[in-house]
């Protein structure tokens, strides 16, 4: 009785797919296109926000060291992605890499997890784009209706002289301290975030029209934001005061993570997320002209250029203004103000750069997700409709339309905080699996030609995986619970649909009933069936209640505040194993 859930896709089959020019995608991307694609995915508004805030709270001028540490740590994962992308130039990214090393079930988990990284990221960043666009239009005296510029149900209040803003407890406290009667102000609730929905719809249409057109748009956005960053850095150097860099490493306050070397490492963890996005380059592998050579250049080149820009921004920003003054939503704008009235013209240009940066990030995320859907559909784990390629545009138009539609709905109704944390944990999980997969494949298939080789294996992959796991551990418990719920849904889809439609499973005549996993599921199914047939009813109810109490009690100890989420996870842990077993064995018992 062997393992069937972990069937590995033959790597030769992937290499044959990569060599097949009839896959449908247009091979139009050069090394330059791939590099700008990576920069487009990495550099968003974070460079204008995280740099100042991390310096003010954790590291001071030594934020420069934090960027170097974080860049090196992210490069560990980048090196692993570069080896895989050059060796297996298929659009599936981490999903495909896991399929060749860890098997189908774990590949499905990663593919399902990547939805959190790409689709949810597109929605998250589009909400940020909306905020910058509303602010930019206000500078031009163009005012959008407040009810259509925030997530559905968001409580808004109209502050005289400021306009409509989101009501928060801190804002109410601040207004009350200033003698303003908050109850007397106008209140309303947002309906949907129209600007966020608009940018997703526009970019989805662009991606359907063609990869070449999308790459050209991305190039313009990247040139715009990088150009503005370089202008700010050059001008800012003339306003640097060396006194602002002293002490370069502020002494620790006595609390871990607040300045000193512990603050440098804490800041490195915070700004790590400013590097996320380079992996999206690997989803365009089948559209690269020379993927074996150009994919590593695109992945590592974009990481290197972004790191240099981050470091230069950190040096200038902490040099023109003392770091304690950077704890604001727009630290770069504060830095521009410190240069004097003559430099006021830079403020709207910074906003334009932020809009360009966010636009390119949304584009890259919307590009990556449909190509992962396409690859999963080719493997039979998703319906075949997801693998359709437009005859004229040669893009996965059905997957692109679905991705865009779901992203539009999420961006229109959900707040950015929930979306952002799910993106972070989903991305880190994918990075971890890719790092581990490199070690597996080096041992299993050392004979495969590798145009690019990750150095110092297994040290580099292990360091990459450890750093990512460490970052995941720092995320809130409720984010982990949301991830578990998301994975429960994925398990159901896999066992109800994907395991039956898998191309490899059908081709090899996989019989789950005769596998180790089948024996376990059969036991679960039999146990629950007996439980549900117990009489009297009170015994049945008590048994089910007991099964619910065990996980609920554990979650209550870990996180006592989220009652509804505890109930949901406990119910999932109790019911989902039965649903999975039932879906597999219902035909056997029928």
Regions found by a protein language model. Give the residues of each.
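A generic transmembrane alpha-helix motif of multi-pass inner-membrane proteins
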Residues: 421-422, 426-427, 456-504
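C-terminal membrane-solvent junction of multi-pass transporters and transport-like membrane proteins
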Residues: 188-191, 203, 385-397, 431-479
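Membrane-interface "cap" regions at the ends of multi-pass membrane proteins
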Residues: 1-52, 56-61, 74-79, 88-91, ...
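Hydrophobic, membrane-embedded alpha-helices of multi-pass small-molecule transporters
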Residues: 29-48, 190-203, 236-239, 254-308, ...
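Hydrophobic alpha-helical segments and their helix-loop junctions in multi-pass secondary transporters
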Residues: 131-141, 223-252, 315-321, 431-448, ...
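TM-loop-TM module centered on a large, flexible mid-protein loop between adjacent transmembrane helices
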Residues: 96-97, 103, 135-151, 161, ...
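Membrane-interface loop-to-helix entry segments
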Residues: 130, 188-242, 299-303, 420-433, ...
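Extracellular loop-to-transmembrane helix junctions
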Residues: 26, 50-162, 166-169, 178-179, ...
């Amino acid at each position: 009785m062997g393992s069937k859930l972990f069937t590995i896709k033959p790597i030769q089959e992937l290499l044959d797919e990569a060599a097949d020019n009839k896959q449908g995608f247009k091979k139009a991307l050069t090394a330059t296109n791939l590099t700008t694609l990576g920069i487009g995915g990495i550099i968003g508004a974070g460079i204008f926000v995280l740099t100042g805030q991390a310096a003010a709270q954790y590291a001071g001028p030594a934020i420069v060291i934090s960027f170097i540490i974080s860049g090196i740590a992210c490069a560990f994962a980048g090196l692993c992605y570069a080896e895989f992308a050059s060796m297996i130039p298929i659009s599936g990214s981490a999903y495909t890499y896991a399929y060749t090393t860890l098997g189908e079930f774990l590949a499905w988990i990663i593919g399902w997890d990547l939805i959190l990284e790409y689709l949810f990221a597109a929605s998250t960043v589009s909400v940020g784009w909306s905020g910058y666009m509303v602010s930019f239009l206000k500078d031009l005296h163009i005012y959008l209706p407040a009810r259509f510029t925030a997530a559905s149900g968001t409580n808004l209040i109209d502050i005289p002289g400021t306009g409509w803003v989101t009501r928060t407890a801190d804002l109410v406290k601040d207004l009350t301290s200033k003698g303003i009667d908050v109850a007397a102000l106008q209140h309303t609730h947002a309906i949907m975030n129209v600007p966020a929905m608009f940018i997703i719809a526009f970019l989805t249409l662009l991606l359907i029209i063609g990869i070449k057109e999308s790459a050209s748009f991305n190039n313009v956005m990247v040139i715009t934001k990088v150009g503005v960053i370089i202008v700010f850095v050059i001008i800012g150097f003339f306003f640097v005061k060396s006194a602002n860099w002293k002490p370069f490493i502020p002494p620790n306050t006595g609390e871990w993570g607040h300045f000193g070397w512990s603050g440098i490492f804490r800041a490195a963890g915070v700004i790590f997320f400013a590097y996320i996005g380079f992996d999206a380059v690997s989803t365009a592998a089948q559209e690269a002209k020379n993927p074996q050579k150009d994919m590593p250049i695109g992945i590592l080149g974009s990481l290197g250029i972004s790191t240099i820009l981050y470091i230069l921004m950190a040096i200038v920003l902490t040099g023109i203004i003392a770091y304690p003054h950077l704890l604001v939503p727009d630290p770069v704008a504060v830095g521009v103000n410190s240069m004097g009235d003559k430099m006021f013209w830079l403020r709207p240009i910074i906003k334009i750069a932020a809009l360009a940066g966010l636009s390119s990030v949304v584009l890259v995320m919307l590009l990556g997700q449909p190509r992962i859907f396409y690859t999963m559909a080719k493997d039979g784990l998703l319906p075949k409709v997801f693998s359709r390629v437009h005859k004229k545009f040669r893009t996965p138009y059905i997957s692109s339309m679905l991705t865009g539609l779901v992203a539009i709905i999420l961006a229109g109704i959900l707040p950015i905080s929930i979306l952002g944390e799910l993106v972070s944990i989903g991305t880190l999980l994918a990075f971890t699996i890719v790092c581990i997969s490199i070690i597996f494949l080096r041992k299993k298939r050392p004979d495969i030609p590798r145009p690019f080789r990750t150095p110092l294996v297994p040290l580099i992959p292990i360091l990459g995986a450890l750093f990512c796991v460490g970052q995941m551990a720092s995320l809130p418990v409720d984010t982990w619970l949301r991830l578990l719920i998301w994975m429960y849904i994925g398990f159901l889809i896999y066992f109800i649909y994907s395991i039956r439609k898998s191309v490899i499973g059908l081709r090899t005549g996989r019989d789950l009933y005769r596998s180790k996993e089948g024996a376990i599921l059969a036991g679960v199914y039999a146990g629950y069936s007996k439980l549900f047939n117990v009489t009297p009813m009170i015994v049945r109810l008590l048994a089910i209640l007991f099964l619910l109490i065990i996980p609920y009690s554990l979650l209550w100890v870990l996180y006592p505040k989220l009652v509804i989420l505890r109930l949901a996870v406990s119910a999932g842990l109790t019911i989902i194993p039965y649903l999975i077993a039932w879906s597999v064995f219902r035909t056997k018992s029928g």
